[in-house]
Amino acid sequence: MKNKNSGYKLSLNKLYNLKNQYYIYILASKRNGVLYIGVTSNLVKRIYEHKNNIIEGFSKKYHIHKLVYYETTNDIESAIRREKQLKKWNRKWKLEIIEKNNPEWKDLYFKLI
């Protein structure tokens, strides 16, 4: 649900990581646009921060707000390893993993909230 400040309202339970899961995610500015790869323990909260430009940096500068891919793991070390691995991939491989799992490049954030 969008509020009048162009942000998104979230219920409190969505803001906290209750399952002890970790997420590796890819954001895009648009289909085949600029990509951002990150890791977090709370995907809903983190994407909310990206969408509302709460986080200073690359994603804010290049308007990268669309969640197009994510993976889960129960181990922070493996999440960080996977994030580093994806960041080393060439662009073609990154686009292929998105296309394979989300061929329409839908914003997956709205399925999470």
Residue ranges of predicted features:
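GIY-YIG nuclease catalytic motif and its immediate N-terminal context
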Residues: 1-56, 60-72, 77-84, 97, ...
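A common structural junction motif
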Residues: 89-90
